């Protein structure tokens, strides 16, 4: 059984799914399994020791609609002993006042925030405001494929290595 569940909201061929697949590739398919939250439930979450949760911005910085439905399942899951890492996609140029706010909303809705790892630097981004920023850091990996696609792969690689250490794998 794999130890890490990667859960994403959105289309199976969308940007969030592509990031989830890259994360899985870096961790190894023997370590991580991908789930679309649209097709997942509490039992899927409960079978993993570690969780990686990903969302795209939806509307103006909102959490993807699939997450709105799944968040209740997640809240009912046994999260007390699980380490959790988050990632989110956004557009800092078109929506600088709500950059990766879906990521921030996901973090805010989670119980056991103390179990969240994988915080990242806000340096190299240009935005006005983000609910995903806490104490000068993002609550997870922030991806802007619209304006900084050339940085996406290295950001994912560095973040996965950080999360691997914080998960103690």
Tell me the role of every PLM-derived stretch.
Residues 18, 26, 30, 47-169:
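FMN-binding flavodoxin-like domain, especially the glycine-rich phosphate-binding loop
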Residues 2-26:
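N-terminal beta1-alpha1 ligand-phosphate binding loop
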């Amino acid at each position: 059984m794999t130890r890490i569940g990667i859960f994403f909201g959105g289309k199976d061929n969308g940007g969030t799914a592509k990031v989830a697949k890259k994360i899985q590739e870096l961790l190894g398919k023997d370590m991580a399994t991908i789930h679309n939250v649209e097709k997942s439930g509490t039992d899927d979450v409960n079978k993993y020791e570690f969780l990686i949760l990903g969302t795209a911005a939806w509307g103006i910085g909102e959490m993807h609609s699939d997450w709105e439905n799944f968040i209740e399942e997640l809240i009912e899951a046994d999260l007390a002993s699980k380490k959790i890492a988050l990632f989110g996609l956004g557009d800092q140029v078109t929506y600088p006042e709500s950059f990766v706010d879906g990521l921030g909303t996901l973090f805010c809705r989670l119980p056991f925030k103390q179990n969240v790892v994988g915080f990242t630097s806000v340096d190299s981004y240009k935005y006005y405001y983000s609910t995903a920023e806490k104490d000068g850091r993002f609550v997870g990996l922030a991806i802007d494929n619209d304006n900084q696609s050339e940085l996406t792969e290295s950001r994912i690689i560095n973040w996965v290595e950080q999360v691997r250490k914080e998960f103690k794998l």
